[in-house]
């Protein structure tokens, strides 16, 4: 079995949970902070965000954007869009990564963060583990922009 099954937040397809319970604004903010810093170590990171129509998607979009920009990343919003479009835009427009805010087929009160790497594929488990470590650690563990 892969180590991913023992991860605290990320599962087989991103970070999902009931909005404001298992997945909250601080989780999204800190995920954004980490991704903005991680992809911005060698150049100014370019990260695109898409979302579904769930009410909580709007607050998660704002929290991610705040975290990303606090780390110096340029953020591009696709707003409401289908999940595959984020992968397509990341790949064709040379973004460092993309984030889709959606819990797919899960109930309306759930939501999720699906992080897509620069090749348009699911983010590597090693990076997801580092995001989890940062979420559970101090905010100042990485520098602000």
State what each model feature region is:
Residues 2-66, 70-71:
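An N-terminal, well-structured beta->alpha segment
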Residues 3-5, 18, 113-145:
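Gly/Ser/Thr-enriched, mixed-charge loops and adjacent short helices
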Residues 12-14, 52, 80, 101-104, ...:
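Fold-independent oxyanion-binding glycine-rich loops
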Residues 13-15, 86, 131:
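Bulky hydrophobic/aromatic "packing anchor" residues in well-ordered structure
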Residues 26, 84, 125-129:
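Generic alpha-helical secondary structure signal
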Residues 36-39, 68, 72, 90, ...:
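Structural signal for hydrophobic packing residues in well-ordered secondary-structure cores
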Residues 46-110:
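N-terminal small/polar loop signature for handling phosphorylated ligands or for N-terminal nucleophile
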